[in-house]
Amino acid sequence: MCKIYKGFLLSFQTQKEKGRGTDREGYIMKDYIITTDNNADLPEEYYTQHGVGCVYLSYTMDGKHYSHENFMPVEEFYAKMRAGSLPTTAQVNPSDARALFEPYLKEGKDILHIAFSSGLSGTYNSCRIAAQELAEDYPERSIIVVDSLAASLGQGLLVHLAQKMKEEGADMEETARWTEEHKKNIVHLFTVDDLNHLYRGGRVSRTTAVLGGMLNIKPVLHVDDEGKLIPI
């Protein structure tokens, strides 16, 4: 059975399983894993050390496609951007999300996925679709997909705090509920050297980019309550 609750998908467990940890008053703790995407900007070592799963967005630059297996070094990436190259990103599609989720389901684990803001990408929706499809194939498992309404280390902070709760013994529903209730407390404040990159990537309006360039103004940007990038 599936239910939409406060913006995330929850596929309820249909039966109790043996062999799981037991919480207070005999409640059987279901084993689960936290997953996210690489927009959280967490180090690769973090995913390995804490057992957090990650799905990766790909990008194209100068006609060449780059995926997780062949991402160019960061220094080279930004050197190309300064020289005028513009990367275009591709959102995670449902099959990508399914490839991340399904192995954990086969291991008997439930999944809490904290996704890149739906106001900046279709990645959240792709993960939600994959979760709905997998709920039919694995009715005994649970998948919760949370729209973080955040990006970069704002999203990464939510992932880290959720993982900390998990490691301290919180169950998946409790961790998901806390994440959902506190995600709008994340504050993003930053600026960039060149607004044209954000404009060409569809992240800020043409007016913001043109005026900022003409006046040599670098506005402070933030992510609003709808998960969209706007200047203050």
Task: Go through the PLM ranges and name each one.
Residues 96-127:
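N-terminal glycine-rich phosphate/adenylate-binding segment common to multiple enzyme folds
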Residues 80, 108-113, 136-146:
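Glycine/charged-rich beta-loop-alpha catalytic/anionic-binding loops adjacent to active sites
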